[in-house]
Amino acid sequence: MKYTYKISKVKISGDLMVFGKIEEEFKEFLESRRKYNEFIKNGLIDEDEALKLFKIDNWRDYLKLFDIASRVRDYFKKKIEITSTIHITNICHVNPKCLYCGFAAGTSKEGYYEPFRLTDEEIKKSAIAIEESGIKRVSCSSAHGYQGKEVIRALKIVKKYTNLEVLVNAGADLTEESIKELKKYGIDTICCNLETINENLFKKVKPGEELEDRIRVCKLVNKYDIELSTGLLIGIGESYEDRVEHLFYLKNELNVGEIPIMGFNPYKGTPMENHPKCSALEQAKTIAITRLIFPNIRITSPTPTIGAELVQFALFGGASNVATVIPKNHPMNVKGVGNPKTGNLEEVVKMIMDLGLKPKLDWRRYENYLKIYGK
């Protein structure tokens, strides 16, 4: 079906004429495919315009922002991806621990708390269950201290027994050799979130890590021509200027295929348990601005950070992937990295479809799954 351009009638408030410029540039792109590469390279906004959009503070401007970001998403992404999760181990050797972490053993009784390491059989059963639910993509995450060996182990098992697309996330705990090994076994995406590029803030909330180590891993992923996922953790004390600088660092210094936008959500028992939660609206705004900078990439919202019941905020903002979605047949008790609550598959699918969007699923498998596990 031909994509038709519609200019919204929402009134532009204040001096944010940036919306008019965005509308005109998007219209120009749609009417002239010859400018595709230039459009992708430059996006729809620059640093100053991004900062103006971060400072919007009324419903009219929010609606306008979400409208254009969603239309850009819909042009490039015809379906909304759904990514499930396998947590391989929470035995983390980072010391001292990240101040917000509720994933690592011993950090929060709301999280896993007790140490675990999945067996090969548990990884296999989890992957098969995820594929049988109709989900087509999985994230395999590991704590630090293994030089990538744990995610390599998981990748080999998942690829052997399923056709799932695989993202692995071990943060900075990857060497050049482990990245080469991941490529050898067919990795689709490697995630290494920078979280913030404000070095002082990074060191404050992640005292056991160095930002340089995460940047090094991102550059190695680019070096070996593997899709790179790297995102922002927002609401941890960064400024809007920090977010803009971070997004344009990704734009100008790295080749990024996926950006997760993760809002801070406090875990009880951690040093940041009393730090305010990042609202779903703030996350949606950040997603929308990211979409205008990166028109065609996968922008991800994990259900534990947006809030499992608030996924539609992320979709309003132009997200194209909902992550940490857990089917009822998953054999493990999965808890979110930013929040113990995760998204239920059937509920996430309904939230996507209620907005007139199409989930990316193996529908035959999903329908069979519903016959067994549906309400």
Swiss-Prot record:
Q: Which SUPFAM superfamilies match?
A: Radical SAM enzymes
Name the NCBIfam families on file. Answer: rSAM_HmdB
List cystine links.
none
Q: Which GO terms describe its biological process?
A: biotin biosynthetic process
Name of the molecule in the record:
Uncharacterized protein MJ0785
Cofactor names from the entry are: [4Fe-4S] cluster
Name the InterPro entries on file: Aldolase_TIM, BATS_dom, Biotin_synth/BioAB, Elp3/MiaA/NifB-like_rSAM, HcgA-like, rSAM
Q: Note the superkingdom of the native organism.
A: Archaea
Binding-site residues for [4Fe-4S] cluster, renumbered to this chain: C92, C98, C101
GO MF terms listed in the record are:
2 iron, 2 sulfur cluster binding; 4 iron, 4 sulfur cluster binding; biotin synthase activity; metal ion binding
Radical SAM core domain segment(s)? 78-302
Record keywords: 4Fe-4S, Iron, Iron-sulfur, Metal-binding, S-adenosyl-L-methionine
Phylogenetic lineage: Archaea, Methanobacteriati, Methanobacteriota, Methanomada group, Methanococci
